[in-house]
Amino acid sequence: MSVKDVNKRSGELEGKLKGKLFLGGTKPSKEDVKLFNDLLGAENTSLYLWVKHMTSFTEAERKAWGAPVKVTATTSASAPAKQAPKKAASAPAKQADEDEEIDLFGEATEEETAALEAKKKKDTDAKKAKKEVIAKSSILFDVKPWDDTVDLQALANKLHAVKRDGLLWGDHKLVPVAFGVKKLQQLIVIEDDKVLSDDLEELIMSFEDEVQSMDIVAWNKI
């Protein structure tokens, strides 16, 4: 599979997984296992480790990395013959006379000064670009109405219309309870430093004409 194919497949999967923890919603299934193995292979442990390491860095950190280090392979047959570094011992003696001609206290050229300033600016910009890892949580909660006359779909639309920094609305569904009454089950993702449990409860219960109570079913750190 080419890099182009991987990018295309990744884009399709991003659309399927948007607002979800798994392909089926809140619980993993055999479909998730099959897709995972199709993408990475069932026994590619080194690839798993690489993906895990890569996802531990932010996009800004990855962009700040330099070029890859080139490593030249050395065969066992040629290794013993490479004794050339020992000849470097004569270099200091040869350079002794040349050192006298070098101005150790000479001023840097304009090119050297400009290069140094550019490097300092690049390092400063790289540090500014680094971001701390943002702690997030996925929360699944139930919203129970007063009775069966409450339009839960309309309530879900009202909730999703609420925009708040650090809050992402995911999938929702209507689950039968009893006697024709249903409850709204909603999945969200929050940034822990921006949205607290009290904030969430206050938001849901503010729709007091429709909402009788809310209960958190699952709370998982991402």
Swiss-Prot record:
This is 25 kDa elongation factor 1-beta. It comes from the Eukaryota. InterPro entries: eEF-1beta-like_sf (IPR036219), EF1B_bsu/dsu (IPR049720), EF1B_bsu/dsu_GNE (IPR014038), Transl_elong_EF1B/ribsomal_bS6 (IPR014717), Transl_elong_EF1B_B/D_CS (IPR001326). PROSITE patterns: EF1BD_1, EF1BD_2. GO terms for cellular component: cytosol; eukaryotic translation elongation factor 1 complex. EF-1 is composed of 4 subunits: alpha, beta, delta, and gamma. Keywords: Elongation factor, Protein biosynthesis.
